[in-house]
């Protein structure tokens, strides 16, 4: 996953009236970087990596609009969400097809399932090309013009941004508790979304809270990896269960055989997630992270042992 563009000169004392427009423009440029590759050539399928990176960049742009947007700029977030959704439709199809292609080597019928998983990609790719044309023609230029409105009172290390981070942490804490047994795909997915949103905000406020934000990003890496693995498996199970009921005879047989493998895989991934959630509770990770954004925004050294560091993870690990 590509890192967000760094902006030289931003520091804890930088006014939001300066930092806000710079961060919004940087996040906008990050999205635009992938336009050509994500459109593809002719009627062909878009580049897999470009779709992935552009989707993440669009999420980061939405986070910037939520944090700094006002007036017309804030209203453009829905347009960015529409682009993100079009990218997500293609990305999900590509991810699922790739898994079934690999699985096809191990089990009869896997090739048939790979074709089924990628069956919607031509239509999704067409919708994505249409969405990118709209983005290029109207949405991106509008964000560029309105970026100057991304202001607000205070500094990068001020109370306002610290409060925003604490609010995201509170949401994460609630969803950690709700998903603690890792049984419900819906609750796991909601936790995954909360972790993503917290990550993208932490990236934005890192120049103001460098120590606290780096600790937060590192702590989120192993959690997001476990959540991502389990979510992808849950999506496969849901779709295959539907195919096992409604597909053609050979498809139903292949789907049932693959479902047995997937349920075993989900059990392993759920155990791994439960271990990570248990670690967060035992080490009071949320409480430790919150301290870095408390006391009026002053830096506080985190006392949490970050598993990401112990396992050799980097804070920029995939968070798709």
Where are these regions (language model features)?
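Function-determining surface determinants
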Residues: 1-320
